[in-house]
A protein has these predicted regions:
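Carbohydrate transferase catalytic cores enriched for Leloir-type hexosyltransferases
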Residues: 1-378
Length: 378
């Protein structure tokens, strides 16, 4: 059996989707042959896991396609890439290569790696599946093009993998996909990496990881943290990810949190250190498809506080402290105080639950269950 993976999911230098794909491919049973329709990529997971030999580094990028800078340079690049198929961007090169591979028919099953309709005119009667990672676009009503593509592909795919039961139920509810057409396969857990255990931050701190836009509910978390430190002023809030936006800076200043909130760009080893030494990890998001940072925190024995939304109870089980939070209303401050008064025994019991919950998540298991989906189709 030969499975063809197309290019889209491997395009970014680093992303959750590319990590998922590389993990399942590297753990795939030996009876599953595969090919990735990809010519150019600087994806770190592909390189670190040595999944493709001799892959080319992208030559034409938004920064260098012309040898000078000007306003809207990246937007012009995007327009050229979209409307001029011969423009030699990695996306155009990889798309054409994927189309050639799909037209050749030299595969038994296509595993489409995102949600884009480009391949439908070329696939003929060959079956395809794809993986649904979340339903953010539909639930928060943005990126209409992606919503449309997901709806079309959900009807035409022979089968769909959902990464959580919650995501499956959203897909069934929103697009009317039959239960039997969707298989839930959870992610595996992260590999524990070696790191210097010396503290990066000397104060006790609450750790926030990842993006902070809209549905991530970060603004409310700032307000909650502000309330908490009125009494417990020794704590900091450490945020990994991008620089604070103007709105975030304004709110941080308004809440007088400038000396209490720290933003950091971190490496994988630094992130492991931050998890390991954190007083707790907080995940206030209103919606996620899976929530991999939960398992990262579990891996480094960090107590976890979760918003009781979407897939979080499914993934974390009873190995977390749950709170209820949405814009302008939250009981997170009370839960932080509750954790503050935990005895050492209670913290150790919580961490033991985390360790046991983490055992459910294994990439070999994820790959095996994915291979079973492939086999059942063919």
């Amino acid at each position: 059996m030969k499975v063809l993976y197309d290019y889209i999911g491997f395009a970014p230098r680093i992303s959750g989707v590319s990590r998922y794909l590389c993990e399942i491919i590297s753990n795939m049973p030996k009876d599953i042959d595969y090919e990735i329709a990809l010519k150019q990529s600087d994806n770190l997971y592909l390189r670190n896991m040595k999944i493709i030999d001799n892959i080319e580094i992208p030559q034409v990028t938004p920064d260098n396609y012309v040898p000078f800078n000007f306003p809207l340079k990246k937007k012009v690049y995007g327009a050229l890439q979209r409307f001029l198929p011969t423009f030699p961007s990695p996306n155009n090169i990889n798309r054409q290569y994927s189309i050639e591979k799909i037209k050749s028919g030299d595969f038994d099953l296509l595993h489409h790696t995102r949600f884009n309709e480009y391949f439908l005119p070329y696939i003929g009667k060959k079956p395809f599946i794809f993986t649904i990672h979340d339903m953010n676009h539909e639930i928060f009503n943005y990126r209409k093009v992606d919503q449309h593509a997901k709806k079309v592909l959900s009807k035409k795919a022979i089968h769909i993998i959902a990464i959580s039961q919650n995501t499956k139920e959203d897909l069934m509810r929103i697009y009317g996909v039959p239960d039997k057409k969707i298989t839930v396969i959870h992610h595996g857990g992260p590999k524990k990496i070696d790191f210097n255990k010396e503290k990066i931050i000397n104060s006790p701190y609450l750790l926030y990881v990842g993006k902070r836009n809209g549905y991530k509910n970060f603004i409310q978390t700032l307000k909650d943290f502000s309330e908490f430190i009125r009494k417990y002023s020794q704590f900091k809030l450490v945020c990994t990810g991008g620089a604070f936006s103007k709105e975030e800076i304004q709110i941080i200043n308004k809440l007088k949190l400038k000396d209490y909130v720290i933003q950091m760009f971190v490496t994988e080893t630094q992130l492991a250190n931050l998890y390991h030494n954190a007083w707790a990890f907080v995940y206030p998001s209103l919606y996620e498809g899976f929530g991999l940072p939960i398992l990262e925190a579990y891996t480094y024995k960090c107590p976890v506080l979760l918003n009781k939304k979407s897939c979080f109870p499914e993934i974390a089980g009873d190995a977390a402290i749950y709170f209820d939070s949405q814009p302008n209303t939250s009981n997170l401050p009370q839960k932080l105080i509750e954790l503050y008064h935990y005895s050492e025994t209670q913290r150790l019991q919580l961490i033991e639950k985390e360790t046991n919950q983490l055992k459910q998540y294994n990439w070999k298991k994820t790959a095996q269950e994915t291979a079973n989906v492939y086999r059942n189709i063919l």
